[in-house]
Amino acid sequence: QAFDGVIISHWSDTLSYTSALVSFLFRHTPVPVMLTAADRPLADVKSNGLENFKAAVDFITNAGLKGVFVSYRDKQGKQAIYLASRLCQADAYLDVFTPFGGAPFGYMEHGAFIPNISPCNPKPEELRADQKPVFTQPPVFITPVLMVQPYPNMQYDLFPVQNTKVVLLYLYHSATACTQGEEATSVLPFIERCRRQKTAVYGASFKRRQASGLYATEHALLQAGVAPLFNISPEAAYTKLCIAYNQNETET
C-alpha cells in the first residue's frame, strides 16, 4: 500500500451524516480513514481545526488500527476519537459532537492513542479483523428517505407519502410517539397511510427486543407494522436506509 491512512476534511454541519456513510461503505479499508472538521474558520485563532487534523495524523501514525473514525475535540478540551458510525450531530450552542451511547472510542494524548474502555465500545483488537467490502460497484442514491422526528402536537397529515418508498420515524428516547388523540397528531393513522401506499416504515431507536419489557406505545407501533431498529443514532439509521433502498447489488 502506498499510504498509511486517509484524512477527509469536512464541513462540520453534516459531518455526522458523512461519517456514518463512509463508515458503512468503507469498513473494509486496510488503513484508517479519518474524518475531521473545525468549529470555526481556520483563520480564527480559536478554531480547533488544526488540533483535530493533527490528532487525525497522530492516530494514523501511532494507533495501529483500521476502520473509520472521527477526530474532534470534546467539550472538556480532550482530543477525542469517535467511531464514525456513532457520531451524533454537534450541539448548536457549544459546537461539540457527542457519540451515540455517550462514550468516545478513545483519546489522543501526546500523540498516543488511549482507548476508552467502555461496554459501549468494541475492543481495539476487534477492529483489526478483516472485513469484506459491502459493494463491488459504486453506490447510488436516487430514492430519498423521509425522516420524521416526533414532537408534541406534530401534525402527521402534513407529510405526503404518495411518492415515498421508506420512512424513518426517529422516536422519543423510549421509542415512543403519540398514538392517541386526534387523527392528525397520532402517528398511527400516518403509519396506516404509509401501509396503504406500500411505504416501508422503520422506527428507532428501540432498546428492548423482548415484548414483555415494552411500553404500551412501543407495542402499538410494532403492531401497526413499524420495523424496529435497535440502538442506533438518527444519522446511522437514516444512512443505512439510504444505502439499503438504493442499491440493486446483493451479497453472494
Show the residue positions of the predicted features.
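Active-site histidine-anchored catalytic micro-motif
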Residues: 1-252
